[in-house]
């Protein structure tokens, strides 16, 4: 069986056949009951726009006077003839192809236009994100936020009688000392900065900080400043050798290094960006410290019941922090 693909009445959907109905709206042809004519029509259509013309409609189909259409059923109501100048133009062939092979797009509104954006509606659809008047500041649990640091500064002034004009200097001095000694909950921050007036022990400063947020989160907020101080003075963390980090990555040997590249930390331009070796070394340092952390009197590295089976030993004691060993 062969088909004349250039014939204007040929249709390839849903199966090859000849049909005069537009867009198959009333098409009920079946090859099993109504086989196509064995001889193609003698009238040839115009050439198509491409050489590979199988199964495609011509851009400008020829008139079909030689193929009579069935007469319309008689209507009981009289119809008014349409003037010649008001006759509807035929639908372009490109649009017919799109309608035949592509379904109309549907949305969650079932084709209806989405409503105007209303912030009072939890299901509002913002068509243009630039029109949303919303400002966002990055925040994370591992880094203190500006409100917490402001509250800590006011507490220093109220409790430790610190000069309000120097609260930032005390904060940077404490964070720089924690880069050497660690910022874990059990870390003992020793010493004081003799250049600041009044002279306040860093351990007292850290005690006030822990009432508002973890000391590590506080130091991570100022990590970019601490990083610049170490790079500019060429002074890596004091315990970099103890951490087992290679000399080429020694500046990353502090436990709040994650705040250096975080958008939630206090932004200052960096003297230089951390290298890939420094980032990997810091992650390796964390993994080693956690793996070597002693358990509750056992040799297990985790307290999960799947490992401990609910057992404890007689010599159980508080676990020291991984960065205070």
UniProtKB/Swiss-Prot annotation:
Keyword check for Ribonucleoprotein: yes
Bias type Pro residues, positions: 59-84
Pfam families according to UniProt: Flexi_CP (PF00286)
Major place of residence: virion
GO molecular function: structural molecule activity
Domain of life: Viruses
Cellular localization per UniProt: Virion
Region of interest (Disordered), residue spans: 30-89
Family stated for the protein in its record: Belongs to the potexviruses coat protein family.
Full protein name: Capsid protein
């Amino acid at each position: 069986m062969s088909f004349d693909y250039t014939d204007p009445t040929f249709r390839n959907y849903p199966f090859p056949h000849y049909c005069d109905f537009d867009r198959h709206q009333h098409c009920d042809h079946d090859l099993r009951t109504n086989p196509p004519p064995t001889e193609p029509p003698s009238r040839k259509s115009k050439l198509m726009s491409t050489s590979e013309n199988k199964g495609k409609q011509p851009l400008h189909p020829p008139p079909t006077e030689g193929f009579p259409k069935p007469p319309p059923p008689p209507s009981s109501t009289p119809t008014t003839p349409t003037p010649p100048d008001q006759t509807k133009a035929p639908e372009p062939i490109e649009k017919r192809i799109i309608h035949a092979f592509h379904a109309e797009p549907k949305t969650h509104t079932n084709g209806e236009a989405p409503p105007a954006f209303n912030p009072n509606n939890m299901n509002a659809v913002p068509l243009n994100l630039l029109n949303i008047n919303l400002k966002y500041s990055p925040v994370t649990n591992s880094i203190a936020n500006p409100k917490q640091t402001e509250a800590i500064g006011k507490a220093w002034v109220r409790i430790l009688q610190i000069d309000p004009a120097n609260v930032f200097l005390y904060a940077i001095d404490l964070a720089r000392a924690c880069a050497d000694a660690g910022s874990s909950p059990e870390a003992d921050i020793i010493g004081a900065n003799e250049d600041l007036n009044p002279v306040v022990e860093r351990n007292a400063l850290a005690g006030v900080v822990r009432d508002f947020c973890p000391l590590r989160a506080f130091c991570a907020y100022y990590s970019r400043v601490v990083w610049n101080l170490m790079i500019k003075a060429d002074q890596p963390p004091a315990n970099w050798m103890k951490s087992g980090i290679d000399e080429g990555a020694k500046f990353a040997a502090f436990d709040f290094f994650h705040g250096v590249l975080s958008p939630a930390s206090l932004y200052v331009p960096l003297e230089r960006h951390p290298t890939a070796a420094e980032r990997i070394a810091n992650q390796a340092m964390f993994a080693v410290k956690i793996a070597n952390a002693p358990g509750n009197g056992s040799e297990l590295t985790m307290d999960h019941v799947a490992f401990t089976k609910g057992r404890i030993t007689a010599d159980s004691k508080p676990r020291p922090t991984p960065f205070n060993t």
